[in-house]
Amino acid sequence: MNHFPWLTIIVLFPISAGLVIPFLPSTGNKIIRWYTLGVCLLEFLLITYIFCYHYQFNDHLIQLKEDYNWISFINFHWRLGIDGFSIGLILLTGFITTLATLAAWPVTRNPRLFYFLMLAMYSGQIGLFASQDILLFFFMWELELLPVYLLLAMWGGKRRLYAATKFILYTAAGSLFILIGGLIMAFYNSNEFTFDFQFLINKKYPLELEIIIYLSFLIAYAVKLPIIPFHTWLPDTHGEAHYSTCMLLAGILLKMGAYGLIRINMELLPHAHSFFAPWLVIVGAIQIVYAALTSLSQRNLKRRIAYSSVSHMGFVLIGIGSITNLGLNGAILQMISHGLIGASLFFLAGISYDRTRTLVLDQMGGIGNSMPKIFTLFTSCSMASLALPGMSGFIAELMIFLGVIDNPNYSSLFKIIIIIIQGIGIILTPIYLLSMLRQMFYGYKFSNTLEPYFMDAGPREIFILICLFFPIISIGIYPNFVLSIWNSKVNFLLSNNFF
């Protein structure tokens, strides 16, 4: 166990600092905003310090391990650790949450609760990615639900209560299957039950039981990822949530399901994963095309972007199901890439709504002339979303594309069919994104006035978008550094469990 509890500090610091917010002076919102931003920035700097000085790139084992007996009666341990799968997502969480806090600057109604909930989400997300115990993983998974529900129900749009209720019902029901699967794994064929990932890796199950456990976890991840047909909560949630909340949902929350699929299903249940892998590839390919077609029919800007997220997460499913070095590396890169691109698109949709007061694409035409900066940034981020060469999405999707081809266990016919379906999805993506840009910026005038005028992006908004767009370009031009973060872990997982 590591002597200094770095991981415990970064998990508990945000929510602990959030408890101070009720005692801050009540003269306006300025102090609360700056305090929360300072906490998020300090947390991100701590994460960056741990990554730079304590994380070993070539070590595939769990690093900075911490193990404290929390509730001995049920053998509940506070087990934390990081490896290649988790550190990239922890960095993404710190980066996106800090920018989402800055994006929430205009929020003036009940700011104490709003910013506390954001910090509580921060702790839950870091805790989930650092968990090395199924019960702690479940605890952190559940910790996300209440903050998101309240952020949606209190600061959402007109149909916020419907969207919040749908979100909590879907995700809470799905969460139960994590607990069920975890309990079966802990108690099966063991005198002393444990939820420790490192112990459960070496545990063997009959294939039928392993498939049941795998399905139990998969149902929970299917809601969060999301996988069709469990995706219907996502467009409603994104359509009603404040755009800072949307940044956290698209940037981090969806990645929790994909992370669980790799961390638990792929690592702890490899035989069942080999059985289900072709089906994951098939569902992922169908999801890409289905969500792209559905996105094209959406008249609401945020719902269109939400369906594009569902489509892009289909690539992650294919990469995980490919069981190849290229495919799995590409899937993790796609998670990072989509986190940045999705957050930027929802932020742009939000600041566009702040100016036009509408999300209906048919009513947003002709605003490009009065908002050239937003137009330029929106176009650039849309190009990143459609995987333009030189941007992060292109590298990720190309690796996933090649990963399916690289799997020797899939027949040539299967590969050809999947490649054709992926190709259709890749063709549909620019259609719905470019039509969105045309309707917003090139379409008919917003009103009957000669030239509607809206204020363009300010310094704060431009700063947020540059911060998001810079890593998208950097990864697209030179992905080797980012891929090296988790490549050794990917190699170890595949060679140890599948080859």
UniProtKB/Swiss-Prot annotation:
Enzyme class label: translocase
The reaction(s) this protein catalyses: a plastoquinone + NADH + (n+1) H(+)(in) = a plastoquinol + NAD(+) + n H(+)(out); a plastoquinone + NADPH + (n+1) H(+)(in) = a plastoquinol + NADP(+) + n H(+)(out)
EC number: 7.1.1.-
Membrane topology annotation: Multi-pass membrane protein
InterPro entries linked to this entry: NADH_Q_OxRdtase_chain4, NADH_Q_OxRdtase_chainM/4, NADH_UbQ_OxRdtase, ND/Mrp_TM
One Gene Ontology cellular component: chloroplast thylakoid membrane
Transmembrane segment boundaries: 4-24, 31-51, 87-107, 113-133, 134-154, 167-187, 211-231, 242-262, 274-294, 310-330, 331-351, 385-405, 416-436, 462-482
Cellular location(s): Plastid, Chloroplast thylakoid membrane
UniProt keyword Transmembrane, yes or no: yes
GO BP annotations, alphabetical order: ATP synthesis coupled electron transport
Keywords, sorted A to Z: Chloroplast, Membrane, NAD, NADP, Plastid, Plastoquinone, Quinone, Thylakoid, Translocase, Transmembrane, Transmembrane helix
Chief place where the protein resides: plastid
Highest taxon of source: Eukaryota
Keyword match Transmembrane: yes
GO molecular function: NADH dehydrogenase (ubiquinone) activity; quinone binding
Family: Belongs to the complex I subunit 4 family.
NCBIfam families: NDH_I_M, PRK12561.1
Protein name: NAD(P)H-quinone oxidoreductase chain 4, chloroplastic
Species assigned in the record: Marchantia polymorpha
